[in-house]
């Protein structure tokens, strides 16, 4: 079990796809430092923030992004924002997980996330019960 934020890992940024409360609370309870889209933009403004805007923000701050929308790499505007802003992304591959399962999958790979973040972005990794696997952005 994780007991603290890995050394050298910047604060994490959580996309709205992970929810406003349950997943962030579980990750914080494990000691991770993070910000959510709703904390940065406020409620209800967070509902109207485009993926392009928050990808630019996260990349500009060097915040690794945790998300659930791996299709982001196929949408031209979002893919371009991910690439141009050198985003370091980590995406759950299963869309049918409860909050505790989502948090558990991220916590199980958090040391690998920290290791990956030593490298420059942009990149996108799939997160699954088997660990991390780098996704093609070309």
What are these regions (language model features)?
Residues 1-30, 39-40, 92-138:
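Non-catalytic interface/targeting segments
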Residues 51, 58-59, 64-78:
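Acidic, metal-binding active-site segment of PIN/NYN-like and related structure-specific nucleases
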Residues 17-18, 42-48, 69-75:
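Acidic, metal-coordinating catalytic cores used for nucleic-acid/nucleotide bond scission
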Residues 66, 88-90, 125:
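Hydrophobic/aromatic beta-strand patches that form the interior of the parallel beta-sheet core
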Residues 33, 39-40, 46, 83-84, ...:
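Catalytic phosphate/metal-binding cores of nucleic-acid and nucleotide-processing enzymes, i.e., regions
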Residues 49-53, 80-84, 105-107:
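Short low-complexity, flexible loop/linker segments enriched in glycine and/or proline
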């Amino acid at each position: 079990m994780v007991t603290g934020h890995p050394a050298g890992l910047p604060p994490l940024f959580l996309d709205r796809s992970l929810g406003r409360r349950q997943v962030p609370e579980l990750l914080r309870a494990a000691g991770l430092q993070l910000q959510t889209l709703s904390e940065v933009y406020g409620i209800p403004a967070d509902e109207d923030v485009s993926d392009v805007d928050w990808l630019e923000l996260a990349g500009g701050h060097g915040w690794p992004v945790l998300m659930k929308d791996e299709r982001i790499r196929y949408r031209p505007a979002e893919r371009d924002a991910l690439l141009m802003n050198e985003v370091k992304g980590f995406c759950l591959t299963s869309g049918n997980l409860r909050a505790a399962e989502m948090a558990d999958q991220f916590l199980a790979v958090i040391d690998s996330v920290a290791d990956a973040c030593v490298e420059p972005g942009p990149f996108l990794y799939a997160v699954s019960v088997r660990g991390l696997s780098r996704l093609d952005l070309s």
